[in-house]
Amino acid sequence: MMNMLLVSLGAVAGAILRWQLAVWFNPFLTQFAFGTLFVNLCGCFLIGITLGVNLQDAQKLLFVTGFLGSFTTFSSFSAEVSQFILSEKYWRGLAVISAHLIGGLVLTILGILVAKFWVSGRFY
């Protein structure tokens, strides 16, 4: 029961923050859902940090499964790319895919390195 509560609390916070960031960021670029990219890249950086530190099981449930699970959004990313492809805006779709995948990998690695440096004072 406690595990479900931890996941639920994290999920509520993550979903509300994702929604609010989309409301703030998406109007800036009307032809690109910047809010989705922003939350996914932030989520990648944050999960990288969690990989670089030792979290207890309860912390993982709250933050990784709950918060990051609802904060990041693969389904919105997929929907946005699909809309570009179906409207024959292939280059925009490819740009969104590239930004999410390359940016996500780079920020996950950066998060790991930052956490390792924070914990041990070294990047390895």
UniProtKB/Swiss-Prot annotation:
Entry keywords, A to Z: Cell inner membrane, Cell membrane, Ion channel, Ion transport, Membrane, Metal-binding, Sodium, Transmembrane, Transmembrane helix, Transport
Gene Ontology biological process terms, A to Z: cellular detoxification of fluoride
Residues at which Na(+) binds: G69, T72
Physiological role: Fluoride-specific ion channel. Important for reducing fluoride concentration in the cell, thus reducing its toxicity.
Gene Ontology molecular function: any one: metal ion binding
ATP-binding listed as a keyword: no
Sections of the chain in a coiled coil: none
Family to which this protein belongs: Belongs to the fluoride channel Fluc/FEX (TC 1.A.43) family.
UniProt-recorded name of the protein: Fluoride-specific ion channel FluC
Transmembrane segments: 5-25, 32-52, 61-81, 94-114
Cellular localization per UniProt: Cell inner membrane
InterPro entries: FluC
GO cellular component: plasma membrane
Keyword Iron: no
Top-level taxon of origin: Bacteria
Regulation of activity: Na(+) is not transported, but it plays an essential structural role and its presence is essential for fluoride channel function.
Reaction(s) this enzyme catalyzes, per UniProt: fluoride(in) = fluoride(out)
Membrane topology: Multi-pass membrane protein
